[in-house]
């Protein structure tokens, strides 16, 4: 196999494959990328067993077709630090010669036969079709409450994907809070739901961020995997073998107090009050009285206290309630809307952070 490579263009594709490898695995083959070259194009394949990717490499001219498995640890640095804008790769019998200007490097590849066969979406069913921008938004909002570590029960570090009536809903929880977001999709299989691990979802987010927001994304599924197809790549995430709790039963109903206000003003005020409480208990108190001002207070013993007044539209019952400033801030910042509605169902109930006049978050 012999390839001529435009470094800048190729590294964009290579970085996608590189992130899907495993740096901690005892199996060297999982810390590698399979390169398959034909005169029709070049594909890159990588996996850490839980996730995998197949993508078309850009910036590559195929002189001689072939395939090889490149170890990530050293090769990635060589690709990135090779001098000039172009270099060549010449692979013969497991040995590679990389030439860039006057520089020349030799290294070995792994056996192609040892590279695992990646999951295939050929027999997979359609889950839904949605634009990259809409999918990125619903993932960011819907996974807000998921735990970042690998916790047990497994659903705590996962997010539930489900389709119903043409809506893709994503839900997550860490038992202290619950996030739910939905978006209309082009096509969908109603009634399908699955748990996906946050590690894989985070990589989907990174991929979506690199795409045009209008780019169509096709999501497919089978009993073991979810497949995300977009432009010239397919990313696969293994499903979590667990069930998400029946969250519908704990959703707050019958709100009695509503506060609508500018999201940016609320975030700024909360950040200032958080300066006082963040090293204590991170609790802020909201004084809500029917009218046009929301009062926010924070207090830390032996340090000080803060009080903010924010213009708002308030309706319903008067209320004083304490909330966690960190959780409150995260919910406000994940929303992209200029305004936000806070809904309450009493002092001992929950607070819901919602879009104004919408139930999509």
Locate predicted features.
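Structural preference for solvent-exposed beta-strand-turn elements
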Residues: 1-361
